[in-house]
Every structure is written in C-alpha cells, then in structure tokens.
Amino acid sequence: MIVLGIDPGSRRCGYGVVAREGARLTVVESGVLVPGDLPMAQRLGRILDGLDALIARARPLEASVESVFSGASPRSALVLGQARGVALAAAARAGLPVFEYAPSEVKLAFTGNGRAGKDQMLRTARMLLGAAPGLSDEADALAIAVCHLARRAFAVPAAGAGRAAAARAAAARLRPSRRDHRGTP
C-alpha cells in the first residue's frame, strides 16, 4: 500500500509518500512544495501542478490530508482551507480516495503524544522512517501518511473512546524501514 500524506499550506505544502509492506514502512518520496512569492491564485496553481506531478510519479493508492486547525485566526483558517482545497482537488482528479485526520490525531499516532512539537515530529520521522526531513511541513506530511497506514493496517476505529489507545498501539507495531545510527532496527 502506498499513501500520500499532505500537510497543506499556501506558502509551504509538505508531502510524504510512504509505502507499507507488511509492517515495514519505506519513504518513497518526501519534500516541500514552495511556490514562491506570488499572488495567492498563482501559488495555489503551482502547488496543484506540483501535487499532480508527484501523484503521477509516485502513484499512491490513497491520500491523507491534515484537517483544518480551528484555533487559527479566521484569515489563516480561510487561507489554509484554500490550500486544503487544492490538495483535495489534486487527489480527486487522480481518482484517489482521501482521508482526513486532525493534527492531534496524527501526532498521537506518529509520536504517541497528541501535543508533540515540531522537534519531536522531526525526531520521530528520523527514528521511525530513517528520513531526514528538512522542514516540519515534510515531517508532518510523513506523519499524516503513517497515521493513515496505521489505521488501515490495524483497523483502528474512526471514532470512539478507544481511538487514541488503538492509534498508539498500531503505531508501536510498525517497524522502521532502515536501521538507526547504532545499527539496530
């Protein structure tokens, strides 16, 4: 199973394509789309073009996107909503099913801490995936993909009281795709 994780943004859009074979996770491709200092419509167009090219290249079977964080200012939420719309449109145009996860849900599944900071997300990406994301947007996108793979692999329920514990247990069963610096899995 190959999944595309997207951390939408109008200035930086993180993406992470992760493959799961059994319990082994492998990063297919990850990075950040940076459309430059352009008017909003042109930035969104460049992000759409970048996501279209990525989907054609990596051929994911499903996409997962971070849902809107409601604590942002109304203007920030509107801009984020536009960037999410572009991500959803790219996935829909490619015929990919799209799954959405709250930021705290992604952090919990990825690190075991629903309030994990940027440093913890970056460290977990290195430890779990052997990846070296340069920006937190990239680490977040990888985390979104892993969260979705964990849900699919271990039938974590979409709702209910046991959701957090089940997500942590599912993430704990995933093995890194590479050895860490000490040479152990």
Swiss-Prot record:
Binding, Mg(2+) 1: D7, D137
Gene Ontology cellular component terms for the protein in this record: cytoplasm; Holliday junction resolvase complex
Record-listed E.C. numbers: 3.1.21.10
Which UniProt keywords are present, listed alphabetically? Cytoplasm, DNA damage, DNA recombination, DNA repair, DNA-binding, Endonuclease, Hydrolase, Magnesium, Metal-binding, Nuclease
The answer, when asked if Cytoplasm is one of the entry's keywords, is yes
Q: What class of enzyme is it?
A: hydrolase
Q: Which CDD domains match?
A: RuvC (cd16962)
Which residues are listed for Mg(2+) 2 binding in this entry? E66
**Gene Ontology BP term (one):** DNA repair
Name the Pfam families on file. RuvC
Q: Which reaction does it catalyse?
A: Endonucleolytic cleavage at a junction such as a reciprocal single-stranded crossover between two homologous DNA duplexes (Holliday junction)
Output the InterPro entries linked to this UniProt entry. RNaseH-like_sf (IPR012337), RNaseH_sf (IPR036397), X-over_junc_endoDNase_RuvC (IPR002176)
Cofactor note text: Binds 2 Mg(2+) ion per subunit.
Role: The RuvA-RuvB-RuvC complex processes Holliday junction (HJ) DNA during genetic recombination and DNA repair. Endonuclease that resolves HJ intermediates. Cleaves cruciform DNA by making single-stranded nicks across the HJ at symmetrical positions within the homologous arms, yielding a 5'-phosphate and a 3'-hydroxyl group; requires a central core of homology in the junction. The consensus cleavage sequence is 5'-(A/T)TT(C/G)-3'. Cleavage occurs on the 3'-side of the TT dinucleotide at the point of strand exchange.
Fill in the subunit field for this protein: Homodimer which binds Holliday junction (HJ) DNA. The HJ becomes 2-fold symmetrical on binding to RuvC with unstacked arms; it has a different conformation from HJ DNA in complex with RuvA. In the full resolvosome a probable DNA-RuvA(4)-RuvB(12)-RuvC(2) complex forms which resolves the HJ.
User: What name goes with this protein?
Assistant: Crossover junction endodeoxyribonuclease RuvC
